[in-house]
Amino acid sequence: TPGHSSAASDVYKRQGFYYKTFMWPKAFWERVYEPIIRRAAGLGALSGEDDPDVYDRGFRHCDLLVIGAGPAGLSAALTAGRAGAEVILVDEDFRAGGRLLQESFGVGGVSGADWAATVVAELQSLPNVRLMPRSTAIGVFDHGIHAVLERTGDHIAAPDAGKPRQILWRVYARRSLLCAGATERLIGFADNDRPGIMQAGAVRGY
């Protein structure tokens, strides 16, 4: 009936409903609930074929590794670059700027996006600064060693033959600066996990 259908929809539309619903009795999770949910969701199968893509690895050295190309990361890289330090600026996005690209406020009398573009242009003109877009810092280890994964071919529909799809860089940095930004704090209220309910930052961005 419509009433029952609506009630069922309210339950099953909720994000992660199965983690909140199938909690009792505890012994049922492994033997009953989980197998049913896994079968309903479907599991992928390995093809068994060789990976056709090419992957590479390399080494880089710098005085300062800046992780994140938002307003803080751009400012830090620019300051260090102007001072003559060897700088590497990595960001997982294809375009530097971070939240500046989505916010309405400006910086220094210009829009955030224009300010970011101006800073990037100056960084590109400095021979001692290297920009690494589409790159993710995935690990930090002893002695200033950082692992950075650069996606060099994922965004290209038909990459050149022999060009690596990804490069794993071992970056030796005297200092590193984490400028990964912040996550908007979630405000808890009833049914806040239903589809269509977004935080203010997501509304401004999308």
Task: For each feature predicted by the language model, list its residue ranges.
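Glycine-rich FAD pyrophosphate-binding loop
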Residues: 83-101
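Short internal alpha-helix immediately C-terminal to a glycine-rich phosphate-binding loop
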Residues: 51-56, 61, 198-206
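Short glycine/serine/threonine-rich phosphate/pyrophosphate-binding segments
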Residues: 71-79, 99, 186, 197-203
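N-terminal Rossmann-like FAD-binding beta1-loop-alpha1 element of flavoenzymes
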Residues: 63-88
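Glycine-rich phosphate-binding loops of nucleotide-dependent enzymes
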Residues: 106
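Feature captures the FAD/FMN-dependent oxidoreductase FAD-binding
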Residues: 30, 35, 40-44, 58, ...
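Non-catalytic propeptide/linker segments at domain boundaries
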Residues: 13-51
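Single conserved hydrophobic/aromatic residue that forms the stacking wall/gate
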Residues: 1-12
